[in-house]
Amino acid sequence: MKRITVFIAAAVVAAANVMAQDAAVTPFISLEQMPKLVKIMPAPPAFDSPEFANDVVRYGWGKQQRQDSVRVALAIADAEWDDHAKLYLQWKDAFGLAINAEETPEIWKLMETSLATTDPMRKEVKAFYGRQRPFERFNDSMPSHEEDNLRGEGSYPSGHSLRGWGISLLLAQIAPERAAEIFSRGWDYCNSRVIVGAHWQSDVDASRTAASIGFCALQGCPEFIKQMKKAQKEYKAMMHD
């Protein structure tokens, strides 16, 4: 009977997460009012540049990491895009809490609305530069099996890394006492994109800067500040239960 109760509770939480995620989310700031990354970020490294030579070296590093079964499994898990409850779960140990719509509604609302604000920033830059991805250039397979979804979409900047570093910035603002753990996890999350061959290192590096630009824009939004305070209050209450 206990197992059935636990299963039902888990199903309720999962259903709540899906319903919350599927609901239309109004961003804190419209895309038109957000900083234009295409006007800020430089072009990705040219193929004959020293910076691209480093990208190739880092691509080789990423392939070496695939020999580590634990690290490559983490990189594959980090590739999750659609299920946000699974996405946030990647920071559970660092943050100290599992984030979901049912149990942490204020934190969930902050994260979902923030991502709805910053995620779209990447699209114009990707389309403008149309950079070829590593697995495309080297005609390689990906351990995360994302080839069909990613082929033909610009590599620069990395959407996963923009999102992952943005999540780290938000969680560190909620729980500054855990910032070191949170950013360490975020750093590895971003590097997972190099390991699976989805992105060049320079894509990932640029995305950390892009995420910081989006995060700074959020700080000037009164609605964001209000929701951040609610999330911080909820976090403190949950951690002291």
Residue ranges and their predicted role:
Residues D22-V196, G220, Q227, M238-M239:
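Hydrophobic alpha-helical bundle signature of multipass membrane enzymes
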Residues V12-V13, L170, I213:
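Alpha-helical transmembrane segments and their juxtamembrane interfaces
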Residues M1-V6:
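Bacterial N-terminal signal peptides that target proteins for export
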Residues H160-G164, G197-E234:
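Alpha-helical transmembrane segments that form the membrane-embedded catalytic/substrate-binding core
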